[in-house]
């Protein structure tokens, strides 16, 4: 599915097609436009064949066109929602140009629409240039997954195709970009040795220090199956 809401339940039941979501007042609408991602995170639900076949966020019929996404949106009044979030199974900025086109069209109709991006923070490496000027004025919040306080552990977790350079590029090129609001979100993974749903406090403190040095916000949330 392309447009969905989050129910608060665990697993696949936590995602609900917007057509089945009922009253959208005060809710976030999530936009899922691609399966593509430059990482292969060990904690990601998309890693198992079962999830890829059965999870409703997996775009089995290919990526929706800009026109198809806008047609879905045309059925709903976005004045009543809380926030629009580009998220999903893939990295939204793998379709940077298309995402921007969708936002531009929606903001022509809803100029006060709040828009957030959930990203792994690799767009500059994906495109080989600084893409942050294209985010300015379109997104109100850019939420970048941090996950770990050092590059080696981060690479072990994300298995990024860009290797070690990925971590530094995210911190010094992605996080420090001139966005109006820059919210760094640390999405924790489950520590299977400790059977815990969040990082140990000492690692969280290191992540807090990284964000403090960068002048950005850290939001810690537990891993969700």
Please state what every model-predicted region is.
Residues 1-35, 42-61, 78-80:
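N-terminal [4Fe-4S]-dependent radical SAM core
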Residues 64-89:
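Short Fe-S-cluster ligation motifs
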Residues 38, 49, 147-149:
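Short connector loops/turns at beta-strand edges and beta->alpha or beta->beta junctions
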Residues 15-17, 71-72, 128-132:
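A generic local structural motif
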Residues 89-225:
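Conserved AdoMet/S-adenosylmethionine-binding subsite of the radical SAM
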Residues 22-26, 55-62, 66, 83, ...:
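Catalytic phosphate/metal-binding cores of nucleic-acid and nucleotide-processing enzymes, i.e., regions
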